């Protein structure tokens, strides 16, 4: 008599051979060993998969698995919806099978590659991610500084986009895995997990030399008509990486479905891919329409892991907070591991969003405050910024004379290389030293600027001011600011010193909490312990009275290219006169630099008195509160 798996059943009698587990050769049954073969379950053929099913009491599924030719490499990607499609109607049977498959995948010896990261410790990455890392396009990130010119101010800031990208890929896996384990009903499958990790790994492939200096300073000057964004370049570089290294087949072997999963990965990096959908999404990110094609609205939360366009809470920030603080020597006050413990998905309207516990709202405000502190103390450091400005000047002057070979033997300039990924792969921070050590007479001006950077002969900082919120300077006016400043000649300036527009650099900086003037917490949803399924909104006044009233400001810094003492003294008076003319805030050293000028503006004189009066009122109020507290 045969069992359900078609094999002869073993006799269950009291004979010594049966009790001892010994079966005569003619009675032996081929069994799944559960030992050595389990380590290589991805290499199983259909029959070996069926033996595994039979050994776990799931032999009735053998026919289905044989008919659909399901091999070992598919097992870890099977989900409940897949089993339904296979006409497995019994819920209990599906759950038993998924439980067995989960144990198989977890208990088999790991095929992951281990990296020892200074921030996250020993981390494991999927072999497909390692295949992506081991390509020239990804290795290029080893030669692009994470913080650009900040390395010239902070000696420890020598880290590169390479290690940051690996960290983001790892954290993306941590978050999606946490959601999968906490909420199996979300039906996050292995395809989803792998795509999210790949998106995290590849999100910065498109960065140019010195990272944000390239897209924030150089490209707007060298090629303003291109509207270059490193996210779009990351998508183009990702396509080039996959095609030039023949990774499509490796992706399919690991269970990905092309081209849908490629679309999903690219959408996580750069947002909606079609221009119409992107424009609609940028104008109204909370719109009810669904702009993505890689995943349905049912899995909308997956788009909030790598680059969260909704509120800015994503694994990219988590890694650069920890990594940048480590290398800068600045304290990091945000603990992403705590966020992982409380993250869960809740429905908000027709979409599903990643939410956190209501008690975590204060920590999220601290997270955005940490971001603001990093910008003030490091990313927008006045010396780091002027060094990047000088490097940008050198690159702009060198741009027409640098030739980088691209596809089909065509050559491109620095700014033109973004149109050809073969050329762009060769463009890294090394271009700095290529210019610095060049003997080309066409690069003389650029070379001299970089030599000044090397000798620390920098453009001199003149001062800083703030425009009022109702008089913000628009980007299309930036080019006119140096000329406007040069025309603000103070009456008491030195007659033998004349300054022109080309002598000034005016740097306009935007500081915010990541979403311009908006409070990003307004776009975060929380849940409470009483009902974890219900998403709620928490207003700022429900948290604390000490939180910021405004979430964005504009800072204007002025530098002078002339470095002699007389020119600098005159430049500072020009600057103060310009601030008076434009009704900007009084420079911090205004009373010291030009004590004869600042009293001429009434609002500047009254500022101190107003602040003193306000301080007295606050002190009196605090005193009354204490009296009331101790007399009750």
From Swiss-Prot:
Cellular component GO terms held in the UniProt record: nucleus; site of double-strand break
Protein keywords: Allosteric enzyme, Antiviral defense, Chromosome, DNA damage, DNA repair, DNA replication, GTP-binding, Hydrolase, Immunity, Innate immunity, Manganese, Metal-binding, Nucleotide-binding, Nucleus, Zinc
InterPro entries in the record: dGTPase-like, HD/PDEase_dom, HD_domain, SAM, SAM/pointed_sf
Positions with a binding annotation for Mn(2+): 164, 203-204, 316
Co-factor(s): Zn(2+)
Catalytic reaction list: a 2'-deoxyribonucleoside 5'-triphosphate + H2O = a 2'-deoxyribonucleoside + triphosphate + H(+); dATP + H2O = 2'-deoxyadenosine + triphosphate + H(+); dCTP + H2O = 2'-deoxycytidine + triphosphate + H(+); dGTP + H2O = 2'-deoxyguanosine + triphosphate + H(+)
Residue span(s) of domain SAM: 44-107
Residues that, per the record, bind dATP: 146, 161, 207, 212, 317, 320, 324, 371, 380
List of residues binding dGTP 1: 146-147, 161, 317, 320, 324, 371, 379-380
Residues engaged in binding dTTP: 146, 161, 207, 212, 317, 320, 324, 380
Localisation per UniProt entry: Nucleus; Chromosome
Family: Belongs to the SAMHD1 family.
Protein name in UniProt: Deoxynucleoside triphosphate triphosphohydrolase SAMHD1
